[in-house]
Structures are given as C-alpha cells and as structure tokens.
Amino acid sequence: MDTWMYLSQGFAVALTPENLVIALIGCFVGTVVGLLPGLGPINGVAILLPLAFALKLPPESALILLATVYIGCEYGGRISSILLNVPGDAAAIMTALDGYPMAQQGKAGVALSISAVSSFVGSMLAIGGIILFAPALARWSLAFGPAEYFALMVFAIACLGSMMSQNPLKSFMAALIGLGLATVGVDANTGVYRFTFDSVHLSDGVQFIVVVIGLFSVSEILLMLEHTSGGGKLVRTTGRMLFNFKELVHCTGTMLRSSTIGFFVGILPGAGATIASAITYMTEKRLAGLNAKFGEGDIRGVAAPEAANNASACGSFIPMLTLGVPGSGTTAVMMGALTLYNITPGPTMFTEQPDVVWGLIAALLLANVMLLVMNIPMVGLFTRMLSIPLWFLVPAIASVSAVGVYAVHSTTFDLLLMVGLGVFGYLLRKMHFPMSPLILGFVLGEMLEQNLRRALSISNGDTAILWSSGISQTLLVLAIAVITLPPLVRLLRRRKADPLIPDARPEQGA
C-alpha cells in the first residue's frame, strides 16, 4: 500500500506545470539527439547536465529533464536506423537489420510505428518492474561479479554467429574483426601500446562513433552512389503509415518476451541496452524458426530490439536508485547530477528523498506516453526522408557524420579513419559480410577484456574463477550449446533428408 501512496506522491511532483514542460522538452530533445548518428543518450544527457544546474532547477526537475532525454534518445535512435541504415547509437544496431529492409520495401511507416509501440511497451513494463520489484531485483543483480559478466559477454559473442544463419562463419569472422578493433590502444593494466603503429592518435583506441559512422554511414553512402542515379529517389513508400491489427498481434509475444529479457539485462550494472537488444533479437530469430525472414524485413526483428533496449534503459535505473551503482553509462552521468545537488544515490534515497525518486518514476511513465503521442503522428514526416533526392541526402548524411566524428577529438585523423573504415566496410558488404556482428564484437570486446582482467586480478591469476559460480557455469554451457547445436541440427536434418546416409547404404559388389 505504501508503494501506491508514494507513487501518487510522485505524480503530484511530475504533474506540476513546470515539470510537465520540462518532461516535454526532454522528450523532444532526446528524440532529436537520438536520431543523429553518433551522439546517443550519454552525450545528450551530458550536454544538458550543466544547463540543468545553471538554470538552478530543483533536483527532481533536473533528474526529470535528464531522464526524459535518456528515454527520448532510445526512441530516436531507431529513426535513422530504419530510414538510413545508420544507427543513432549502439543499441539501435539490431533495429537496422530488419528496419532498413522494411524501409526499402516501402514499409518505413509500418517499421517506425511498430518500433514506437514496442519502445512504449518495453518502457512501461520495465517501469512497472521498478515500482513493484526494485529492492529485490537490486539484490539479485549483486550476484554478478566480473567472472559472471565475462561469461555473459562470452555468451553474447557466441550468439553472434546465429545473426546470419545463411553464413554463420562470416558472422563469426566479422565479430572477430570487431574484437580485434577493440584491442587497439594502450593496455590499461600494463601500459603497452597495442596495434597503434606508433600513432599517438590511436593511443586511446578507436572511438565507437568513428567505427559505427565509418562502417555504417560511409559504406552506405558508397552503396547509394553505386546503385542509384544522382537525381533518383531511394525508395517509394506505400500509403500505409501504421501497422495493422494482424501485425500487432504477430508482434505481441515478441514485445513481451523482449521487454522481460531487456529489463533483467538492464538491471545488471554495465550490461546495457546494446547487449539486451542483441540477445533478444537472436532469441526471437531462433524461436521464429527456419521460415522466418529475419534480416530481410521481418517486423518482429524491429519489435524485439526496440522493446528490449527501452526496457533495458528503464531497468538501468534500479541499481542507480537502490544501490548507488550506475546501471549504464548514461545513469552514471545522472548520478553525477545527483551529487551536484548533494544527494547520495542509494537505498536511503527512498526514505530521505522520496519526492525525487517517485517523481522520477512518475515522470518516466508520463514521458513514455508523451513520446508515443509525439512519435506516431510524425511517422509520415519521418518517411518523407526516403523521398529526398540523393543529390541532397548523400551530402547531408556525409556532413552530419563528419561533424559527429570531428566532435570527439577535433582531429582530422578521426575523419580519415572514418573514411578508411567506410571503404573497408563497403568492401566487406560487397563480400556479404554482416556489419552488425562486427560492431557488436567491437562493443563487447572492451567489456569482455575488462571483466576478464578484473576476475583474474581478484583470483591472483587463477582461471578457475571464470567458471566457479553457478551463473558462470550456466552461461558458459549456453555459449557452448549455441556454437555446437546449430551445426549438429543441420547435420541431423541432412542425414534425415538423404536416405543414402553412409551407414545405411547397401553393400557394393557381391
């Protein structure tokens, strides 16, 4: 009963005219920042943090502003993924796998509308989980140490091969290239320079924005220039801007499953929406069976990652609010905002600052309604981007990409590296290598190495720690199963389809 009393108190905070306006501004700014390639939620929140403090907003209003920008970015990231095949952030990579093919088939409006509803469902279910189970779930998340996170990363990387069932070998090779890129830079433990080729610009490693813009945006520009004429249109959209009832029913189970998985992944500090969207996409692809068209424009391939990454984003508030541990990079920035107001994140917030905590939770509920109402009517406007002539669209994408990359270090080296990676990505795509496993390998590689180092540091180099807990053992067994079972299943199917299997052939010559 206390929970509902506190929630009503939170709505009293969130429904003040000032906080409603702040939430609306945060939703709009977050959507715009999210659709711009390379910025992402962490940059959006970081940009507005000093502004919130400079405006002397009260702590609950400042947190509402930053949280709504965060959620808005998760909504916005899908737009450029679906329309241009350029993910707004890492969490939107999986959305492009089926969203962009749908756009190319003239179904951009359907993809955008179902992704908005999936984002809404994922967020609302996750917020419900925060309201009902936050303290218990926070205690569960503490069971994950470095060894368990290492096993989780191994499982996620093992799953990458299933992203292209037609050629899992190329998926694994792409993931290995991504893992290799993640090792570039100075080793944090030993100070050794790795694969920098005596270039000081590579000492900090290859930045994520440079990789994602190069491999997706620049390579896409090269493909546009190759396959279309200068004045033509990319695709012709259909008149239907919204999904129909049959498509909604088709995606309902996907949304619910993906929201649940995304929520639990989001609770794990540092796991993030990228892992959640990858795991749910591959889970749904396996559940869909051989007749599904994942990677070719399956609507479930859009619904799954969008429900998961929004559920994960909301779930990441649980460790921040209950343990004082950031659930993601963005919530780490938000924790910095709380310290500016002399508020210590953790379990005492629920008793000492109930207006801040429950005002934030209520604002998240309102923000998701705002974002759904804001995004659905704008589907038609977004799809108009597909009718923009290439003589304008290509320079626009190139300019936005270059500005986003240059903003990281303000060096021309990053621009040259972006172009080089773009040409490399173009060649890989011509050879039918998938880009998403490469990017995910790059993102997961750093986390894999960090958690491996931490685990071995705790055990003084004893590798047994990596499989000492039940969680680690379960995840590693699942990783082995993911790698070994698909080839075995294919072999059994071939043997069943071929009546002349080796041990059943009639003897020759008597």
Task: Indicate residue ranges for each PLM-predicted region.
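Helix-loop-helix hairpins and the membrane-proximal interhelical loops
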Residues: 1-60, 135, 139-142, 193-298, ...
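Transmembrane alpha-helix interface/packing and boundary motifs in multi-pass membrane proteins
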Residues: 27-41, 72-85, 160-165, 260-269, ...
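Short helix-coil transition sites and intra-membrane helix breaks within transmembrane domains
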Residues: 33-43, 82-93, 125-129, 265-275, ...
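Re-entrant/interfacial helical elements at transmembrane boundaries that shape
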Residues: 41-51, 66, 81-101, 132, ...
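Membrane-interface alpha-helices at helix entry/exit sites of multi-pass transporters
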Residues: 59-64, 101-118, 289-302, 329-332, ...
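A structural-propensity feature for long, helix-poor, extended segments
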Residues: 70-81, 88, 298-323, 327, ...
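Membrane-embedded alpha-helical segments of transport systems
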Residues: 71-76, 117-129, 137, 181, ...
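Membrane-embedded alpha-helical modules
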Residues: 113-230, 340-493
